[in-house]
């Protein structure tokens, strides 16, 4: 790996220096969320962690992440003990800011380690491709925006996910892959959306004989079952003993929230909401009835029960059924391809797509659940890259509304555009020519046109709209345009990758 330049370590050092410069940048309410979790886990006994509600930002991550916060709090007391007081709401001394920002960077070493393992696990002929993909993840504008400005710990947890995926590459480490993924589920439950792909792959490849599903490997079944059950027992056992499992369920799965987040995530429901919004204007001419009570919801994107003015309502059951259906399709191929790692990663990616496109109350940040695993196989050949390109554009541009302050506008825009131009150009140059011809070569032209529209759209939504309409008029339009534009790219990418996946 000495000939791979620049190395992961070199890029990580330069990126760290840049991220340190961002310490004083804008931070979202998620910063206070994690400060409060530091205080809760440090100040209260474990059995009170999921009952504490002094702050509205209650602990709603699984126990292993709470334990991670507890570990951080043991060091935080030396930086500024005041940050660990539960009643010290919205406390953000410089010591607190620097400490919390630094923990994000340090925890990202897990991502660097996982990417290094990914490169080492690649066949010798593909190591340079794995290296390029790894650099694109390490320097991702998504992680920069969400983790190092907005504030979260996604780099750390996606490092655990990548490590689990890499461990699934060899039969000898499949057991550790399943256990690592179980640990990840006990850290952030959004990864449940990927669990069916793991279940099918581990069952077919590790628990059953690849040559016959009627020959179970009882030793492997026992080891995997014992390992996974042990992980969940350690995580949830104490809360079961304290009879707190229902309380954890209410915290981890707050289904009282509406279909759409305040800013529509770029998915099917964003397009559905956009069509509903357009039909409000056309309804009088078309003779359609309008639900007057829903007008506030469709224009403001409130977090409560989302209602539609013209189109039929969407229930939780609808979203669950659609998500399961579109996850089931790639799992059929995965079941029929035991031991095929590329098919496994493709199935993980498509499970991520299905949950993001059809899920209930999806956050725009969840687009990384697609981008990160897809990046690992985006350079398999140019057909994969063609499907990945519009996702990379749409997914990263859709994150811009997270940073709405003027000071961060040039940072997010210049960094993201530079990343897109650099890595999409490099990907285009190095992606191998596929053995089969591309079914829809027009997709490439669509991707280029889609990229060309991104820059003027960003300029309008971030600058021109306020100059034209002011701060009070049509304030929902920029978010609606950005969300709908991004949704078009994500959905187009999903359709393209579905075709590639099933014809590969």
Curated annotation (Swiss-Prot):
GO-annotated cellular components: endoplasmic reticulum membrane
Localization (cell): Endoplasmic reticulum membrane
Gene Ontology molecular function, alphabetical: dolichyl pyrophosphate Glc1Man9GlcNAc2 alpha-1,3-glucosyltransferase activity
Bilayer-crossing regions: 4-24, 96-116, 129-149, 151-168, 183-203, 221-241, 262-282, 343-363, 391-411, 414-434, 451-471, 480-500
Keyword Disulfide bond appears in the UniProt entry: no
Topology in the lipid bilayer: Multi-pass membrane protein
Residue ranges that the UniProt entry lists as topological domain Cytoplasmic: 25-95, 150, 204-220, 283-342, 412-413, 472-479
Pfam families (UniProt xref): Alg6_Alg8 (PF03155)
GO BP annotations listed: dolichol-linked oligosaccharide biosynthetic process; protein N-linked glycosylation
Catalytic activities: an alpha-D-Glc-(1->3)-alpha-D-Man-(1->2)-alpha-D-Man-(1->2)-alpha-D-Man-(1->3)-[alpha-D-Man-(1->2)-alpha-D-Man-(1->3)-[alpha-D-Man-(1->2)-alpha-D-Man-(1->6)]-alpha-D-Man-(1->6)]-beta-D-Man-(1->4)-beta-D-GlcNAc-(1->4)-alpha-D-GlcNAc-diphospho-di-trans,poly-cis-dolichol + a di-trans,poly-cis-dolichyl beta-D-glucosyl phosphate = an alpha-D-Glc-(1->3)-alpha-D-Glc-(1->3)-alpha-D-Man-(1->2)-alpha-D-Man-(1->2)-alpha-D-Man-(1->3)-[alpha-D-Man-(1->2)-alpha-D-Man-(1->3)-[alpha-D-Man-(1->2)-alpha-D-Man-(1->6)]-alpha-D-Man-(1->6)]-beta-D-Man-(1->4)-beta-D-GlcNAc-(1->4)-alpha-D-GlcNAc-diphospho-di-trans,poly-cis-dolichol + a di-trans,poly-cis-dolichyl phosphate + H(+)
EC numbers: 2.4.1.265
Keywords, comma-separated and alphabetical: Endoplasmic reticulum, Glycosyltransferase, Membrane, Transferase, Transmembrane, Transmembrane helix
Principal location listed in the UniProt entry: endoplasmic reticulum
Family: Belongs to the ALG6/ALG8 glucosyltransferase family.
Function: Dolichyl pyrophosphate Glc1Man9GlcNAc2 alpha-1,3-glucosyltransferase that operates in the biosynthetic pathway of dolichol-linked oligosaccharides, the glycan precursors employed in protein asparagine (N)-glycosylation. The assembly of dolichol-linked oligosaccharides begins on the cytosolic side of the endoplasmic reticulum membrane and finishes in its lumen. The sequential addition of sugars to dolichol pyrophosphate produces dolichol-linked oligosaccharides containing fourteen sugars, including two GlcNAcs, nine mannoses and three glucoses.
This protein's name: Dolichyl pyrophosphate Glc1Man9GlcNAc2 alpha-1,3-glucosyltransferase
Gene behind this protein: alg8
